[in-house]
Design a protein with these regions (language model features):
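Core catalytic lobe of class I
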Residues: 1-298, 325, 330-332
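Class I S-adenosyl-L-methionine-dependent methyltransferase module
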Residues: 106-107, 300-332
Length: 332
């Protein structure tokens, strides 16, 4: 396996290299959960590396190349376990007369062809004004609405697409005292707080039931969009201005619902380390692969700081396990 750099600790492993090449070194059925955000079909270009899937020549070529990655994730995933894909539909352009490409639907159909079973779609609400400021999309301008609202669109949601590998899950993901943590912007009602960690009948556990109602909703309007890991130091001068890590609330919910403590959580597109950080913070072993050296270096910095002072990582971010799956010496 060819990697540019790597760091392996008791709780996490990070590899600077091509995820396709790295996954070849992972045994079958060795991962309990994968959660990640792939490039959005060439909407943004993350590097000039020809191995970067964001550099595909067409939308169709992106889906074809992405299918190779999704197929290998299926190979390394344990039966009955989950892969969770963060994505969004993408515009055909920014002329003010554009249409949307059904990326989420194409990702679903591609995974089904490989053998994954489509389980759920969660919609993550986004503030239209914030989206406009970030993208300058003409279809979101009030001026466009005033001049000709037939050319207007909406601030499309992000999606978390959930797929299950065929077969039986040999280790149930149980919550014997219910869900004990809520991650999101809402405040739990005062009358349910006394049930947090309830070890009696779970039919009485009003805290866990309240949390579950938030998580079981198809529309996640309580994700804190600003709760992300630091990323500004990872940007090269030629980087586009879109860089924004996956929200930690989304990652925390996925890790809590679809893995057990001690499980291996994998991401093929590690970026600045968000998924690995979330896994380790919740007592799992995180394994991540990142092709771009500047992102990889930022991920290492975030993960090292998380080990010593996790609260500082998230505070900084708001300004915007050792695994035996790979051999440490296998680096050339």
């Amino acid at each position: 396996m060819a990697v540019i750099d790597q760091r392996v600790t008791d709780g996490w492993a990070a590899y600077n290299g091509d995820c396709v090449e790295v996954m070849r070194g992972l045994p079958e059925r060795s991962v309990h959960l994968s959660v990640y955000s792939p490039p959005f079909a060439g909407l943004y270009h993350y590097s000039s590396d020809p191995r970067d899937v964001s550099n595909c020549r067409s939308y169709e070529e992106f889906i074809e190349h992405y299918a190779i990655i999704a197929k290998d994730i299926e190979r390394i995933t344990k039966p009955g376990r989950i892969t969770a894909v963060h994505c969004a539909d993408v515009p055909s352009g920014n002329t003010g007369r554009d249409h949307m490409l059904d990326l989420s639907g194409d990702i679903i159909r591609m995974h089904e062809r490989i053998g994954w079973k489509y389980v759920a779609r969660y919609s993550v609400w986004k503030d239209p004004f914030v989206v406009y400021i970030r993208t300058l999309a003409k279809s979101l301008r009030h001026r466009t609405c005033v001049e000709d609202s037939s050319r207007c669109s909406n601030a499309g949601a992000d999606y978390l697409l959930v797929f299950r590998k065929a077969g039986d899950n040999e280790e149930p993901i149980a919550h014997p005292i219910g869900l004990t943590e809520y991650v999101g912007s809402k405040t739990p009602p005062a009358d349910v707080l006394k049930y947090r960690g309830w070890d009696g009948k779970q039919t009485e556990n009003k805290y866990s039931q309240w949390v579950w109602r938030q998580y079981a909703s198809a529309f996640w309007d309580d994700v804190r969009l600003e709760r992300v890991l630091p990323f500004r130091d990872s940007k090269d001068p030629e980087d586009e201005k879109h860089v924004h890590p996956l929200q930690l609330d989304v990652i925390d919910r996925a890790v809590t619902l679809w893995s057990n403590p001690g499980d291996v959580v994998f991401t093929p597109f590690m970026g600045v380390g968000s998924e690995v950080y979330g896994a380790v913070r919740l007592g799992r072993k995180g394994v991540g692969v990142e092709l771009k050296p500047s992102y990889y270096r930022q991920a290492i910095a975030n993960l090292e700081l998380a080990e010593s002072a996790p609260h500082l990582v998230e505070l900084k971010g708001k300004d915007v396990g050792q695994t035996t799956m790979l051999n440490e010496s296998d680096d050339d």
